[in-house]
Amino acid sequence: MASLPPHAGPATPLSPTRLSRLQEKEELRELNDRLAHYIDRVRALELENDRLLLRISEKEEVTTREVSGIKTLYESELADARRVLDETARERARLQIEIGKVQAELEEARKSAKKREGELTVAQGRVKDLESLFHRSEAELATALSDKQGLETEVAELRAQLAKAEDGHAVAKKQLEKETLMRVDLENRCQSLQEELAFSKSVFEEEVRETRRRHERRLVEVDSSRQQEYDFKMAQALEDLRSQHDEQVRLYRVELEQTYQAKLDNAKLLSDQNDKAAHAAREELKEARMRVESLSYQLLGLQKQASAAENHIHELEEALAGERDKFRKMLDAKEQEMTEVRDAMQQQLAEYQELLDIKLALDMEISAYRKLLEGEEERLKLSPSPSSRITISRATSSSSSSSGVGMSVGQGRGKRRRLETEDTSGSPSRASRVSSGSRLAQQTVATGVVNIDEVDPEGRFVRLKNSSDKDQSLGNWRIKRQVLEGEDIAYKFTPKYVLRAGQTVTVWAAGAGATHSPPSTLVWKSQTNWGPGESFRTALVSADGEEVAVKAAKHSSVQGRENGEEEEEEEAEFGEEDLFHQQGDPRTTSRGCRLM
């Protein structure tokens, strides 16, 4: 623009219109300067842009070549990894079949050992019975021997008593003979005394008559009354004398007869008692001999039975020792084979883990390259490549503690949730959209031999499994379940319920329509449903109140934003691939694998 000429004359006052035009000219000058500066800046930026476009084209060529090489390498590595995975799966199936066979053989060996142990227990019980019978027989024999000795002592005493009784009997016979002789003698003496008495009586009567005659001669002169009195007194005195004499003879005879009869009765009674004692002693001696013979036969039979039982026990012990040695050798061989199988599986798992790590590194590198290319295409406003959509899937495995053979296999597939963004490169305006999805995370923990094998999302049943080789008592145990933030519900087992080794039990809700069939199928009649939902917590609580197994699931939502640009599509999937990990490996606690 042309500048104003200098004013030669004196300064004149400027009008407001003049002043406004001068200000507008000054503003236009400044704007022209700014426009020229902006044009220079635009030209410099265009030159820089051309230079950057040239560099970008060069980078694209280099990147295309590198991506093609990496893609070829990745595809070959992926094919090798898939081949190794297929071989690993086949090898794992073969090893599982072999492990099943080994476990079946081990179970048969255990059953055989249990059977042998049962036979040994029965034989030991029989031996104990025979030993107790033998000891009882020995005790009875000792008792019989002591009884025999006592009986022999009694027999000796009875024989002594019998000898004494026989001696007494002989003495009694002799005494009886003496008494008989004495009786005869006494009878003779009595007869003699009677004869003497009769003679004395006759003599006495003769004397009385003589005395009476003398008195008659003397008392011729006595008064007749006095004579009668004298006769009466004389007759009375004679009568008294006669009665006294008869009484003495009678008393002597009675006493003699009583003494003789008493001695005779005593002798007969003593003889009868001696005969009875001797007969009883003979009978007892006969019975004792019979009992001794019977006990001797029983003792001989028991000794034969004990000898046969000892021989059988010895044979059973030898057979059991042989079976134990055979079973121990088989068990050692099986354990060695299982150790080799575990080592082989561990080696394959290590190789598989290395392949997964390599695959994860390749996935991350390819993802980084693609993000870099998409950023350059977006900045340079180039058309996106046909493969602008990226899909990332994660496979996670939850480790659960179990007491099996030593391997823990993740089971069950979670539900798949996706986050997708559509390609909006053809739209003239830049739009902002939000896409939402959900994620389901599950966790299973078991500290004992019984774990929670399966929980129905619809709340129809809960299944428990005994993964050990021993029976587990679940008396008064409870299954507690809580859905979201609701109240706890608990199912309580009966006091005598036992879960067999390797078996499962399913507790159905009453609304599921299942049939109550213990011990594998139980129906909770007071509860129509366990509570449906994908976010829950189920716990197995022992009778002491300790949680021995827990299975929890949490359902969460995720969001992704798209601002007129093409972003990633993320696919979260639990159990996308079956990942087999050695139990106790710390790497299996929480590990993810990204797959193209």
From Swiss-Prot:
Question: Where is carbohydrate linked to this protein?
Answer: 391
Residues of the region (Coil 1A) are 27-61
Q: Where is this region: Tail?
A: 379-596
- Sequence segments annotated as region (Coil 1B): 74-207
CC per GO annotation: lamin filament; nuclear envelope; nuclear lamina; nuclear periphery; nucleus
- Please list the residue ranges annotated as the IF rod domain: 24-380
- Region of interest: Coil 2: 235-378
Cross-link type Glycyl lysine isopeptide (Lys-Gly) (interchain with G-Cter in SUMO2), residue numbers: 59, 173, 233, 465
Asked whether the UniProt record includes Nucleus among its keywords, one would answer: yes
Q: Which GO terms describe its molecular function?
A: structural constituent of cytoskeleton
Q: Where is this motif: Nuclear localization signal?
A: 415-420
According to UniProt, the name of this protein is Lamin-B2
Name the species this protein comes from. Answer: Mus musculus
Gene coding for it = Lmnb2
